[in-house]
């Protein structure tokens, strides 16, 4: 029995190993298909996000041009503010506080930090929304926009170099600005008064084709031997196993010493136990004595008429009948006299 169990276990193990080996390529193929599908979807999502970003840049540029500004550093031809002569006041980075086209000249204009190469945030035409330095419209006083202008997403791979564009039209000459107030003594700050501001980077180009895999690197040094592990804590005691089979009978022990005499005590009867399972059917017993005759049952229904029976045997001869009276005279001869004591059958009693 144990040999058969060993063969069966080996066979099952071999079959299991073959099944595992045959299923590994299928699992790898499924994982590869999922990876390719995920890569395709990520590529499509990246292209859509780039297109949306380009559309947003286009809308911001159109709105900026509608406000009367030809570039990041240009000036509009809007109405002059009340705080100076015709035209807007100076608003260069790091310079004195000024007013831009369309501003009413109020004193609550935000102070622009002195950052070299970044255009200031200007307000558009009257009633419009302010324009951020990157050209995108920002939330105005009446708008409910809480956009975060900072882009925390990691930059993608650089796209291919585009074809050079055509030269744009010349901008409108700006109005000379008003001299600013004298500043306090501080470190000299380089300001761009001539030329254009440094334009922000354009939208990210589409991703390039995947490059060839690089050369295989050098084999690393052999790692250090790990520290020997510590013995684990003793496990929890296992559950109680099933009752084992009874063991072999032991050798008969020596005769013990006689026990002490005690009084015989009769204990109280114990509680009635549960009835046991019914036993097996016994052998068939011997035939018993004939019982008493039972009460006669009710008469049954009358049966159908039977067939005609055979003729019975002839009956026994009957006894002789009584003597009859004498008959009438025949009138052809006289009747002889008869003896009254003679029998008729013996032809006696008549006298010749």
UniProtKB/Swiss-Prot annotation:
Domain Collagen-like as annotated: residue spans: 202-259
Composition-biased stretches (Low complexity): 207-259
Gene Ontology biological process terms from the UniProt entry: cuticle development involved in collagen and cuticulin-based cuticle molting cycle
GO molecular function, one term: structural constituent of cuticle
GO cellular component, one term: extracellular region
Domain of life: Eukaryota
Residues annotated as signal peptide: 1-29
Region (Disordered): 73-143, 156-352
Compartments where located: Secreted, Extracellular space
This protein's record includes keyword Nucleus: no
Homology family: Belongs to the cuticular collagen family.
Protein name per UniProt: Cuticle collagen dpy-17
